[in-house]
Amino acid sequence: YGSRALGDIFNMLHNGIVVETGNEVADSILGKAGGMNGTMWTINLILLALAYGGALERCGCVERLFGGLKHKIHSVGSLILATLLTSIFCDATMCDQFLGIGVPAPIYADKYDELGLGRNMLSRSLEDAGTLWAVMFPWTGCGAYQTGVLGMSPLVFFPYAFVNLLNPIFAYVTAAFGRNIFWADGSYTNIFGKTKAGKPAGAPEEAHAKALANLEARRAAGKAPKINA
């Protein structure tokens, strides 16, 4: 393209190019170079999804729907389940992965402290659902990108996305049975029910102190496992 005029180069960048190599397979692959114009549908959908999700966030719809739910939560398993479902709900209705994580986090953060859990437990629960399920809906930013790249709706490969489908289930079931849990003092209860000491996750100082105090109280009451020697 060294002999092309500058205007032609910008036109190719914007509208794409047509490649004719004489090889049918190569043409089918290289001929898809659609330039910036070829990505506009995806970009427009992402921008609309962000605007819509931001409006819902400012309205506080999710907080009103799920804010009262956390007062009925008294176990680690039910808290993890509520976090997972809220995160997936936000993905589906707010159309963006970041809102699927950022909106539920402040709703349940103090509940994790109340049950003596580490903030990394909250982070992992949000990732288990909010990140993995964001790509499962065609109308989210992630889903729109996948549609543009793969040329198919996420609903087509939905039944085969085993990690995305099974990870939230695994997270809830293990937590419900008191397994796979990060505690505020850095200890971790593994899949076999053994609790080992570890390094505490980062958290606001006041929240961390509250979580530690609650963890000690729950251990004294037999509601949380003690560290195995």
Predicted regions and their residues:
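Core transmembrane alpha-helical segments of multi-pass membrane transporters/permeases
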Residues: 2-61, 80, 84, 88-89, ...
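Short amphipathic alpha-helical coupling elements at transmembrane boundaries
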Residues: 15, 64-74, 106-114, 124
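Membrane-interfacial loop-to-helix junctions in multi-pass transporters
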Residues: 34-43, 69-84, 115-122, 154-155
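Hydrophobic alpha-helical transmembrane segments of multi-pass integral membrane proteins
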Residues: 49, 69-107
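Juxtamembrane/interfacial segments flanking transmembrane helices
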Residues: 57-66, 99
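Re-entrant/interfacial helical elements at transmembrane boundaries that shape
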Residues: 67, 97-111, 140-151
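Alpha-helical transmembrane segments of multi-pass membrane proteins
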Residues: 78-91, 115-136, 160-165
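Juxtamembrane and boundary regions of transmembrane helices in multi-pass small-molecule transporters
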Residues: 114, 143-229
